[in-house]
Regions:
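Topogenic membrane-insertion module of multi-pass membrane proteins
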Residues: 1-62, 66, 70, 165-168
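Small-residue-rich segments of transmembrane alpha-helices in multi-pass membrane proteins
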Residues: 40, 44-48, 171-185, 233-236, ...
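Membrane-embedded alpha-helical segments that form the functional core of polytopic membrane enzymes
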Residues: 44-48, 56-84, 145-156, 195-213
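Helix-coil boundary and interhelical linker segments in multi-pass alpha-helical membrane proteins
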Residues: 49-69, 128-145, 180-201, 252-266, ...
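Acidic (Asp/Glu-rich) catalytic motifs at the cytosolic membrane interface
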Residues: 73-98, 208-232, 236-239
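Multi-pass membrane catalytic core of lipid/isoprenoid biosynthesis enzymes
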Residues: 96-137, 227-265, 306-322
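Intramembrane alpha-helical segments
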Residues: 102-192
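Extended hydrophobic alpha-helices typical of membrane-associated regions
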Residues: 259-335
């Protein structure tokens, strides 16, 4: 049991040699191979679904724990299967970005195909078990089966063919907003609320800017490898403009939801992130530099990625404020139900 590696793998995606890998316990190997450091995005989605349920006095702790665990296992399954799919298709070679900024256990010879699929089957089974419990909790409701089916669809087909059809970025918006948070709210409350769906978009768009930024960063190599991400399809300049739009749009969405009195003005604490937005926007107005800027970090969280780390840094600021604003909004709704009605 290597607790130090557990902690490290939850913070970054650690590079390890084959000798180091052989000495690791199974949990450490699972955390590294599933890229556990990024699973926090899914935990936040589950937390947001829970906060919306608390806001409406419909929260139940045990179903929420099953929801959070199931979503995290589903995301982990997706990461494992993505690596397997790309490896089989010959995409993740040593000259590809995925193998540059983090370990790809199959490419690096740390895992065999069979071991990867074993991890995938076990992890996906845990996700399915959580889904079945939630289906039982909701009396095997038809809409819940549809949500489970959509989740399975995106796990299996995100890398191929959706990403190949320039639909990967659209899938991220759907999954991290309406499906995880809106669907999670439905699982907890048995109520589909379109206001909740709209309210999920600021977070979902933030996650998408990071994915979009990464796809812009590797646009040239994706083009050569015939990987048709949306930036490859629409071009680098328009892709950068779309990221800018996705960074700005959440402010207008939240102002609209305050104006319609779904949110209280407390959610507008996100406006504190505007100075950070002004810092990163100039970079998105210009093409990616040919070489690493002198003051830009290298390696994990840095070069050769450029737009992705910038989007991540901004999204971390905005996302933190959004969660804090939602917590404040929930508290004021519970303590002063008549406020801003």
């Amino acid at each position: 049991m290597n607790l130090a590696m557990w902690r490290k793998a939850l913070q970054v995606i650690p590079n390890v040699s084959r000798q180091e890998w052989e000495k690791l316990d199974v949990v450490s190997k699972w955390l590294i191979s599933t890229r556990a450091a990024v699973l926090v995005m899914t935990l936040i989605s589950a937390m947001l679904a829970g906060l919306f349920a608390i806001r409406d006095n419909l929260f139940q702790p045990l179903p929420w724990l099953a929801l959070a665990f199931g979503l995290i296992m589903a995301h982990a399954s997706n990461n494992l299967f993505n690596d397997y799919t790309d490896y089989v298709r010959g995409v993740d070679q040593k000259n590809y970005y995925r193998a540059m900024y983090g370990p790809q256990p199959l490419v690096d010879g740390l895992m065999t195909r069979r071991q990867n699929l074993t991890y995938f089957v076990i992890t996906a089974s845990l996700a399915l078990a959580s889904g079945l419990y939630l289906a039982w909790y909701n009396s095997f409701d038809t809409l819940l089966w549809i949500l489970i089916g959509l989740g399975a669809f995106f796990i299996l087909f995100y890398t191929w063919p959706l990403k190949q059809m320039a639909l990967g970025e659209v899938a991220v918006v759907i999954v991290w907003g309406p499906l995880m948070i809106g669907g999670g709210y439905y699982v907890l409350t048995h109520n589909w609320d379109w206001n909740v769906v709209w309210a999920t978009l600021p977070y979902a768009l933030g996650v998408t800017t990071v994915i979009f930024g990464k796809h812009i960063d590797k646009l040239e190599i994706d083009y050569r490898e015939n990987i048709r991400t949306l930036p490859v399809l629409i071009g680098e300049k328009f892709a950068r403009q779309m990221v800018i739009g996705m960074m700005i749009l959440p402010y207008f969405l939240l102002v609209y939801l305050v104006a319609t009195k779904y949110f209280t003005p407390l959610i507008l604490i996100v406006l504190i992130a505007i100075p950070r937005l002004r810092q990163v926007l100039p970079a998105f107005l210009k093409p990616k530099p040919a070489t690493r800027p002198q003051d830009f970090p290298e390696g994990q969280g840095g070069w050769p990625l450029y737009f992705a780390p910038l989007a991540f840094g901004y999204n971390r600021s905005f996302g933190t404020l959004f969660v804090l604003g939602l917590i404040a909004d929930v508290l004021i709704r519970l303590l002063l139900p008549a406020f801003w009605r």
